[in-house]
Structures are given as C-alpha cells and as structure tokens.
Amino acid sequence: MEKSKCPEVRFKHFNESWNQQTLGDMFLPLSNNTLSRADLNYDNGQIKNIHYGDILVKYAAVLDCRNDKIPFITDGEISDFKNQFLQNGDVIFADTAEDKTVGKAIEISAVDDNYIVSGLHTMAYRPKIKLSPYYLGHYLNSNAYHHQLLSLMQGIKVLSVSRTNLAKTIIKYPSSVTEQTQIGNYFQNLDQSIALHEKKLSQTQNLKKAMLEKMFPNVGSTQPEIRLKGFNGDWVNSQLSNFISIKHGFAFDGAYFSEIETNLCLLTPGNFMIGGGFKAEKFIYYNGEVPENYILQENDLLVTMTDLSKESDTLGLPALLPLIRGKTLLHNQRLGLISFDNDELDKGFLFYLLQTESYHKYIVLSATGTTVKHTSPNKILAFVCDVPEFEEQKAIGQFFKQLDKTLVLQQQQLQTLKNLKQAFLEKMFV
C-alpha cells in the first residue's frame, strides 16, 4: 500500500490505494450559456438556472435541487436547452473570484426539474465513470484537491483558472464504491448538521432583533409592546445626559505601535461587532508608556465615535469589555468610555438600549463626515429615550444577557462543526 495514495484518516476495513485520473480524462465538459441575472426570476418558468453566484455563496459542497432556491429562466423554452440539462453527479466550478475561493465546486444532487448552468465564470462537467453520490462535491472542495489549483491561478486582484489548466488537475478516489459512499455520506451529514446550526443561530439572532424593537417603547409611546411579567406603568422620557457622562480616549503615540504582540492592546472600532458587542481581534499592540487613567477594566462600557463602513455599521454602538487574561486593554481615541453619574440607570439596560434601531438611526442621521462618519459624546448624550423603573431595567438587561449567552453558545457549536469538517477535509482525502 502506497502511503501517498491513501488518506491519513480512513474508515475501517479499507486499505487499497486510491485511483487517480486527470480531470480532463475523467470528465466530459458540458455546454454553458451566457444568461445574466436579468434573464432570471424566482416566480415561474420551465427551466431553472444555476449561476456563478450560486456556487460562491454556498458553504456546502452539494447543491440539493429539492431544497436550494434556484431561479427560473424567464421565457425559457425546454426545446432551446434540451441537450444541456444537468444530471445527478454533475459538478460545476466557479472559475474566478477575488480570493482563493476560485475553483470552488458543487455537485448536483436530487435533480427534480430541468436545470442548466450559465454565466461566463462557470464550468460544468459530467464524470465518465459512476461515483457514489456526494463524494465528488466534497473531494473537489478539499485542500487535497484545491492546493493543485493554487499554482494554476492567473491574475492579481481577481484570480481565475482556465478550462485547460483545470483539465490538468488530478482527481483521486477510492476504488471501492462503498468507501466512496461512506466518505460522501459522512461529509453530507456534517453539512446538514452545519446547516441546522446555522438556521438555529439565525432564528436566535432574529429573536433578539425583534425583542430589541418590541421591548423598548416606540416613538410616541410610553410603554413597550412586549413586557416582562410583573411590570406595568409608563416609562419616563429622558435624555441620556441625565444619567451618564462620556470620556474621550487618549491619542497614543504611533511611534510605539508594535507589530509584535505585547500585553498592551489599543482598542479601535474594529473591536466592535456590527449590532453591538466586543470582539477580541484586530488589536493594535503598544509598547510605550500608558497614562494610568486610560487603562480599561473588565465590564467597562464603551461606544464608538468613528466608522469607516458605508452603512455606519458600528457607529455609536456599545461594547462591554470582557476579562482577557494576560492583556491590558487601553482606552484609545475614537472610543468613548461611559461613566454613570447616579444610580438611576442600569448598565445592562443601557448596553441593550444602545443596540436598538431607533438609537442607531438617530446616531447615523446626526453623524458628520462622508467617507468616514463621526459622532460625539454630546450627540450621544442628547439622545432622548424612555426609561422604566430600575428593577425593570435590570430584568430587561438580564433577559438580553441570557439571549446573548445563547447566541455565543450557538456560535461556538457552529464553529466547532466547521472546524471538524475542515480538519477531516484535510485528512480524509489524498
């Protein structure tokens, strides 16, 4: 048994060397079409069309024609495409992309209608030999196959691979159809589990978004649409300036910024998540002297003052700082540190109030700048909001804190599955 022709991880009872052929010898190229998105619709038609974009956006390696949403060709006639219809087991490549996803492929599964492929950047193939369902789709998305494409890519900003070069790549597969089946089913089950976890995460994200709208009063109302049990009465209209102050960050000297990781981390708007919240990445490391009153503490509440995105995705939004062992977080410029002037406003309640759509809309509309948007402490403090009694504030903060814990757990579970898939994509193919 040749080690180079066998995967590192293998199902029991299989020990034969894998077969290999060039893609050009193993596949027949299929006809392509030059239809654009303008020729398609999602409502009705006789023929469905798989486009370049349908390949790049799909995480899974198999396109399930029963469940994936594929558009129709507007006014498409069967007689015009009858020799081009796809079959189960056909594969489609995206031959260009702005990153190394060029060469991403999907396998067609569960064909229940008339499907064709179109687009200048798609290449469709049909295997000349019968392979087990799901095997090809996952093999073609493995590192074992994709590393062959790296030396064949052309271009600088936009990468591409030609049909001629694609034909030179080597396809490897077990001689045993049973082994092919077990590999294909294993990855297909992983993809289905990932899809279910993504759906669950999306549902929780949508629930939080809906509750942020319904558990805070609408403009002109003194009570929210949805209220926690045991609370009643009107909320009091007030400005944030009646409860809090906001301190600007320090302009740390760029001469002491470090490309080498240190324990001193300057926070930037890049550490804020879209919608609000903290992310421990994109730190700027620092190795200079630090003013003591610009060292941040666990559970400090900060807001962003600057945003570079077109939609001002994080402008004015909050983050509560976690404890990051071995790191000291520094209060950098372009961030505001919130302090509480009295005991009338709960920090948890304020954290989620600053994530509401009405607050963010106010901040964006009052922002200055074109390419770079800016807000200020005064503008944030001038925000007019409705505030309930302190006990209800705490209860609302706890409700959303539990939702966020659920979101973090679901994100971790999803990432674990994706990491597992990536690990086995490297170890179960050659």
Predicted regions mapped to residue ranges:
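Non-catalytic DNA-recognition/assembly elements of restriction-modification systems
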Residues: 8-34, 227-250
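Short amphipathic coiled-coil heptad-repeat segments
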Residues: 1-15, 199-233, 412-430
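Short, charge-patterned binding micro-sites
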Residues: 222, 238, 330
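Hydrophobic, ordered structural segments
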Residues: 186-206
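DNA target-recognition domains and sequence-specific DNA-contacting regions of bacterial/archaeal
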Residues: 27-173, 242-387
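Acidic/polar-enriched heptad-repeat coiled-coil alpha-helices
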Residues: 184-188, 397-401, 405
